[in-house]
Amino acid sequence: MLKIKYLLIGLSLSAMSSYSLAAAGPTLTKELALNVLSPAALDATWAPQDNLTLSNTGVSNTLVGVLTLSNTSIDTVSIASTNVSDTSKNGTVTFAHETNNSASFATTISTDNANITLDKNAGNTIVKTTNGSQLPTNLPLKFITTEGNEHLVSGNYRANITITSTIK
């Protein structure tokens, strides 16, 4: 019994001394920072060009209107025409006459913002920044006529587009 008592005391002292001999390891202090974004939001406002005529709409490089994207926390936007004939054309949006099915004119999108890239693909235009950051909160996009707009009549023209946004 006495041997067991000494054995227990010896084991206890040995455990305590090995713990007290342990050296402290390295310590690190690190600042953790993050950015909390506003909820993603997207709106678009169309402003057609005044005083369009058959002669200036029928030629290329005529400004027909400006679509201004107002957004928060958006990285890229895809603008696609819902016109079936535009799905095979790179970045084209066709405006069709409201009552005359054979009258239409094609446009493409452009911008004056040097920090914006427009990737014109079959059926859509991808709008993104050159450095991968978020789009500016207000981004005007110009709709410019293309070549081959020959069968025009006076009246109202419309184009339907789908705007899809991407967030990270």
From Swiss-Prot:
<feature type="signal peptide">
    <location>
        <begin position="1"/>
        <end position="22"/>
    </location>
</feature>
<comment type="function">
    <text>Fimbriae (also called pili), polar filaments radiating from the surface of the bacterium to a length of 0.5-1.5 micrometers and numbering 100-300 per cell, enable bacteria to colonize the epithelium of specific host organs.</text>
</comment>
<protein>
    <recommendedName>
        <fullName>CS3 fimbrial subunit A</fullName>
    </recommendedName>
</protein>
<keyword id="KW-0281">Fimbrium</keyword>
<dbReference type="GO" id="GO:0009289">
    <property type="term" value="C:pilus"/>
</dbReference>
<keyword id="KW-0732">Signal</keyword>
